[in-house]
């Protein structure tokens, strides 16, 4: 039996030790994994970085059986899929996502990461700064989200960082399979629910 090929994109600031846990997980499921790394939050939300990524990106493979994104990694995936050179895929997994370029999602993330900003209307500030710049990006991303690929969304009832209203509507509209865990914080679902998480992947692979 040939190995599955997996494209893995982690969350903002993911450490190599965490990446290795997911690579080991896929190895145990008879899959080879390519990890696509981005440097920082600025790679996602700075237009000059977008341009550089889209111009210079070189995919490690032309096609992947599965793309596995965690949290904001789904935004970096969008940039890769709109680069001059890119890859195709058959199935996609959104762990603690999918994220969007919408200001509401950005505000939720900033408030969770930097609690002091809860006293500021980050959403309004962002809208005033770059609304025109983000309109095209949002539309492009929407087109990538609603492709006919098979989808699996993994969430936790305890996760307060995702835009839950959007994610639930996305699951319904896209027909994605959904597994919700009773425990586990944002972008940390596997380490808290190893057996259930692994079984969700196995079921999705066999689908």
Model-assigned labels for residue ranges:
Residues 36-39, 179-185:
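Short glycine-rich catalytic loops that host catalytic nucleophiles or stabilize transition states
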Residues 158-162, 187-188:
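Acidic catalytic loop of the alpha/beta-hydrolase fold
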Residues 69-80:
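Glycine-rich nucleophile elbow surrounding the catalytic serine of serine-hydrolase chemistry
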Residues 87-151, 158:
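The alpha/beta-hydrolase serine catalytic core
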Residues 39-61:
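Catalytic nucleophile-loop/oxyanion-hole region of alpha/beta-hydrolase
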Residues 2-42:
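Short, surface-exposed "cap/lid" segments of acyl-processing enzymes
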Residues 17, 160-166:
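Conserved alpha/beta-hydrolase "acid-adjacent" motif
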Residues 44-46, 184-198:
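Catalytic histidine-centered segment of alpha/beta-hydrolase-like enzymes
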């Amino acid at each position: 039996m040939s190995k599955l090929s997996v494209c893995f994109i982690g969350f903002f600031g993911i450490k190599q030790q965490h990446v290795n846990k997911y690579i080991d997980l896929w190895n145990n499921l008879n899959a080879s994994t390519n990890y696509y790394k981005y440097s920082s939050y600025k790679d996602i939300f700075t237009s000059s970085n977008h341009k550089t990524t889209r111009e210079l990106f070189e995919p490690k493979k032309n096609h992947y059986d599965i793309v596995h994104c965690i949290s904001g990694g789904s935004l970096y995936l969008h940039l890769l899929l709109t680069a001059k050179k890119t890859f195709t895929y058959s199935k996609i997994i959104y762990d603690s996502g999918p994220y969007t370029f919408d200001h509401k999602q950005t505000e939720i993330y900033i408030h969770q990461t930097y609690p002091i900003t809860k006293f500021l209307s980050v959403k309004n500030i962002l809208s005033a700064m770059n609304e025109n710049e983000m309109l095209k990006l949002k539309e492009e991303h929407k087109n990538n989200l609603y492709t006919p690929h098979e989808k699996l969304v993994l969430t936790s009832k305890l996760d307060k960082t995702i835009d839950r209203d959007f994610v639930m509507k996305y699951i319904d509209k896209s027909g994605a399979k959904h597994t919700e865990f009773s425990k586990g914080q944002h972008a940390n679902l596997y380490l808290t629910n190893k057996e259930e998480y692994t079984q969700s992947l196995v079921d999705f692979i066999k689908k």
